[in-house]
Amino acid sequence: PQIQPIIDVLERLAPPALQEDYDNSGLLVGEPQTEIQKVLVSLDVTEEVVEEAKSIGAGLIVSHHPIVFKPLRSLTGKNQVERTVMAALRAGIGLYAIHTNLDNVAHGVNAMMCRKLGLQGMEVLRPASETLAKISTFVPSGHAEPVREDPLHKRASVHVRRAETGPP
């Protein structure tokens, strides 16, 4: 498979719109159309993690924490971030981070920790400034598949539920 369908699944799970302003989640290194066979999942990306991905033949590393938080001014290998990015580039391994959007999603990291701790009566301390809206589209049955396959529809779809109705 290519990297893009994996990104699509991750972004349905934790929409990028839930990412904090300071965060840098998403595909950080690599091309969405790259063909891969395996994915390595880690909390952080380090040179050792890239080496492990390489040794098992993983073409994508999905990490919780992004290796790059601030834009890189150079790529010379002078620090751990640059060396790790360079190692991933050399090995042809994509790097994808799913950070605060996974923390903030209703069924994400924070919710899971609260459940594991047995907490009750949880509420959001600082609601997101941007709210998400759900949009439903109704089309004749014969046109449903082309609409589902349209790239704009795919980008806009976070949760798609299929409902069929009979004639009016």
What are these regions (language model features)?
Residues 1-168:
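Hydrophobic structural segments
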